[in-house]
């Protein structure tokens, strides 16, 4: 645990040094509960808080309920999820609803695991305060490639990933996320993670420190 805290502090220091005046610095803090219903089906509930404006502004609360289905053992799985997204706007809170479908393929080579994930999401915006989406729902296809390495003796899993966003209505890929970090399995029920994410948007860039906790029933 002391090693993990040192790792988090190092990430915070690096992020603070790398952010320019035009960019933003934030954080993602998440807690996830998951349960295996059968050999092929897992369900999960996640709460995530997102901070922006140099960690001074509560930007979003995301509540996600999902299920994963193993299609080919250890190599292919599908998933569906629903997210309630509460955004903290200037004078009000805005609630969006998001439907998600995913397909993930993975392969192992020694201690390395390579994976590709395709995700479709449709975000429905509450139009009570006006609609910032020109098209409602806003539909996006996301493609993510990641590599993870296993240190089996210490149950540590460093990873690196890149994810591109394609907005269907605009027919444009205008956002890419790059992430690096590590997951640490404490025991058969508890695990923690820490990482750094660079959100490369068309108009602005945001650097995030990510901290997560997972409990498996």
Go through the PLM ranges and name each one.
Residues 113-161, 215:
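Detector for outer-membrane/organellar transmembrane beta-barrel domains
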Residues 25-27, 59-63, 95-99, 135-141, ...:
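Residues that define the transmembrane beta-barrel architecture of outer-membrane proteins
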Residues 31-35, 65-69, 101-107, 120, ...:
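Residues on the lipid-exposed face of transmembrane beta-strands in outer-membrane beta-barrel proteins
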Residues 40-45, 74-78, 110-114, 153-157, ...:
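Repeated loop/turn-to-beta-strand initiation elements of outer-membrane beta-barrel proteins
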Residues 20-79, 85-86:
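Start-of-domain marker
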